[in-house]
């Protein structure tokens, strides 16, 4: 383990002599470190005082106290919104030459206060029920997004995971004056060359700042052939996935060496190694349950494993897929959604009930073509039905595998496939309720020289087979902002696409594109900062030259290894 800013030790010269009298070692510290220590001591003292103050209260008093505190927080938020509105109005009035008061400017502050509190209560109830309650898709200023790209030294980033406090109401300016980790946001990346790296992403106006890294290698190859003894404290094969715990204490990695490693986020030192104990148990994806220590792992041996990270133990194994479980997603409820690659199914696992729901995909081009022909058929004057020519039909591609998944809320999720499909699913229906085909476009046509060596142009065109050799861009990454109507998709088409789900959760449409993501998008994450209703969103994506699970994608134009960042603001109304 090594810090980026590690200093070399000064060698002692021959002329230096140890002092005869015993002396006390002195530590050279800067004022900021003393302030941090004082802040930590004061925080501990405040925590002890609060524990002593409420030591004798019964459960009913505790519930009453928490309810009062909750209402006070709502009132303070409402007051903040009111003061902001009044300041904005006063500023507008000062800019006017003639100040006139009309019916629009006359409002009751008390009624507005009640409306704000009522709307917040509705949002909290919707969040507890696990339903979408954040509708800010129309407010995003995507065209004004501030984009940046950070080059990294690792080869082919495979995943990125971000840590954000549960109630993050801090800005960068506020957090820089207090505790060094209070309200801070961190990102963790892993790569095919066995490196785990930690970044500070708190300041949205700056690029991610590299803090620490941990490197694996051949020295961690176990000497024993038994899978249950695969407990060396480091990775010796490609790291494919990473997940940061919601409490910020741990970060978990997994990969082709068939084990999970739990790392301390402070020092990036290994805390616990948990082997999958299966020769095919490569860990492909990880997801933490929201505000919990429960971890879900999807593996290449067709199984889903659940863990309790605070106890460093495996809880149970879930069976059902018929191919590798390529991706997994989870939110607040004790359930997760997985996709099984070439078995073309998505499964929702209700873990407490020990049941699952199976959702089947699999587009068939011939059926889709026949359906399109029937929908566009016209009846002639003689009553005969005339079908359009097949050359006029749009391109339909066979769905070979479902590769990525992300939960929108506890009752809806989205999936991405290798034929460019993005599908919206509901638990009430076994088939997708809406499908966007060829979401990221079609790959460029192969040239004549790549297909045929014939000199005759007619023969070469015949061997090119018209449109049959065209292929779509795969959907390599999806991320839905939890409980909202916005999600982001990625491929290797050179841009990320931002989509908005309709208010009735029955369809979605394209909001805009974020250009500059040159390479294969292997993972997307979103963090946010700011007051309620005025959040600023930062989209982070790990970009690589290869697909995270193989080397099928080659020669991507302008591809680079790095972290893509885009900061998006909201309109104030």
Swiss-Prot record:
Listed PROSITE patterns: WD_REPEATS_2, WD_REPEATS_REGION
Superkingdom as given in the UniProt entry: Eukaryota
Biased composition range(s): Acidic residues: 25-58
SMART domains given in the database record: WD40
GO terms under cellular component: 90S preribosome; box C/D methylation guide snoRNP complex; nucleolus; nucleoplasm; small-subunit processome
Record-linked InterPro entries: Rrp9-like, WD40/YVTN_repeat-like_dom_sf, WD40_repeat_dom_sf, WD40_rpt
One biological process term in Gene Ontology: endonucleolytic cleavage in ITS1 to separate SSU-rRNA from 5.8S rRNA and LSU-rRNA from tricistronic rRNA transcript (SSU-rRNA, 5.8S rRNA, LSU-rRNA)
Principal localisation: nucleus
Location of Phosphoserine modifications: 50
N-acetylserine modification, residue list: 2
GO molecular function: snoRNA binding; U3 snoRNA binding
Keywords annotated in UniProt: Acetylation, Coiled coil, Nucleus, Phosphoprotein, Repeat, Ribonucleoprotein, Ribosome biogenesis, rRNA processing, WD repeat
Chain coiled-coil ranges: 32-106
WD repeats by residue range: 234-273, 278-317, 320-359, 397-435, 471-509, 516-562
Residue ranges of the region described as Disordered: 1-63
Gene3D superfamilies: YVTN repeat-like/Quinoprotein amine dehydrogenase
Pfam family, one: WD40
Further comment found in the protein's record: Present with 5130 molecules/cell in log phase SD medium.
Function summary: Involved in nucleolar processing of pre-18S ribosomal RNA. Required for efficient pre-rRNA cleavage at sites A0, A1 and A2, and biosynthesis of 18S rRNA.
UniProt free text on domains: The WD domains are required for nucleolar localization and U3 small nucleolar RNAs binding.
Family that this chain belongs to: Belongs to the WD repeat RRP9 family.
Protein name from the UniProt record: Ribosomal RNA-processing protein 9
Organism: Saccharomyces cerevisiae (strain ATCC 204508 / S288c)
Encoding gene (name): RRP9
């Amino acid at each position: 383990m090594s810090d980026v800013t590690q200093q070399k030790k000064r060698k002692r010269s021959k002329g230096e002599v140890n002092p005869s009298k015993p002396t006390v070692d002195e530590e050279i510290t800067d004022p900021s470190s003393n302030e941090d220590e004082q802040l930590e001591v004061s925080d501990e003292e405040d925590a002890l005082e609060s524990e002593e103050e409420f030591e004798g209260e019964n459960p009913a008093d505790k519930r009453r106290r928490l309810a009062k505190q909750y209402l006070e927080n709502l009132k303070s938020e409402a007051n903040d919104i009111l003061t902001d509105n009044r300041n904005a109005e006063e500023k507008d009035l000062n800019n006017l030459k003639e100040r006139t008061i009309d019916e629009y400017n006359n409002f009751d502050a008390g009624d507005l206060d009640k409306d704000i509190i009522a709307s917040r209560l509705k949002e909290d109830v919707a969040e507890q029920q696990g339903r979408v309650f954040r509708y800010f898709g129309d407010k995003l200023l995507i065209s004004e997004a501030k984009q940046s790209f950070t080059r990294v030294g690792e080869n082919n980033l495979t995943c990125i995971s971000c840590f954000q406090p549960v109630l993050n109401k801090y800005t960068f300016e506020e957090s820089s004056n207090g505790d060094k980790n209070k309200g801070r946001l961190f990102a963790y990346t892993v790569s095919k060359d066995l490196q785990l790296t930690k970044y500070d992403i708190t300041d949205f106006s700056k690029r991610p700042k590299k803090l620490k890294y941990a490197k694996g290698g051949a020295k961690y190859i176990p000497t024993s052939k038994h899978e249950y003894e695969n407990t060396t404290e480091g990775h010796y094969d490609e790291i494919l996935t990473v997940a940061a715990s919601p409490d910020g204490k741990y970060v978990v990695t997994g990969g082709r060496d068939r084990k999970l490693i739990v790392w301390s986020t402070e020092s990036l030192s290994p805390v616990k190694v948990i082997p999958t104990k299966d020769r095919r148990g490569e860990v492909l994806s990880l997801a933490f349950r929201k505000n919990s220590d429960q971890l879900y792992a999807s593996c290449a041996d067709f199984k889903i494993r659940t863990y309790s990270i605070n106890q460093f133990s495996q809880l149970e194994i879930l069976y059902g897929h018929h191919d590798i479980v390529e991706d997994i997603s989870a939110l607040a409820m004790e359930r997760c959604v997985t996709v099984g690659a070439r078995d073309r199914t998505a499964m929702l696992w209700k873990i407490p009930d020990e049941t699952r729901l199976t959702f089947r995909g699999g587009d068939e081009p011939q059926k889709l073509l026949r359906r399109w022909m029937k929908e566009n058929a016209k009846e002639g004057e003689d009553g005969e039905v005339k079908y359009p020519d097949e050359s006029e039909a749009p391109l339909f591609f066979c769905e070979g595998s479902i590769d990525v998944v992300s939960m929108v809320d506890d009752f809806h999720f989205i999936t991405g496939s290798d034929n460019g499909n993005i599908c919206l699913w509901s638990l009430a229906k076994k088939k997708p309720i809406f499908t966007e085909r060829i979401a990221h476009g079609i790959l460029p046509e192969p040239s004549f020289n790549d297909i045929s060596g014939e000199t005759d142009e007619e023969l070469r065109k015949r061997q090119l087979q018209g449109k049959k050799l065209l292929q779509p861009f795969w959907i390599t990454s999806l991320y839905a902002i939890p409980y909202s109507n916005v999600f982001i998709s990625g491929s290797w088409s050179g841009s990320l696409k931002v989509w908005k789900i309709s208010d009735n959760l029955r369809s979605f449409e394209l909001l805009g594109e974020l250009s500059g993501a040159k390479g294969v998008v292997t993972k997307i994450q979103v963090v946010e900062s700011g007051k309620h209703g005025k959040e600023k969103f930062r989209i982070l994506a790990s970009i690589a030259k290869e697909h995270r699970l193989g080397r099928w994608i080659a020669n991507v134009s302008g591809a680079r290894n790095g972290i893509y960042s885009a900061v998006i603001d909201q309109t104030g109304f």
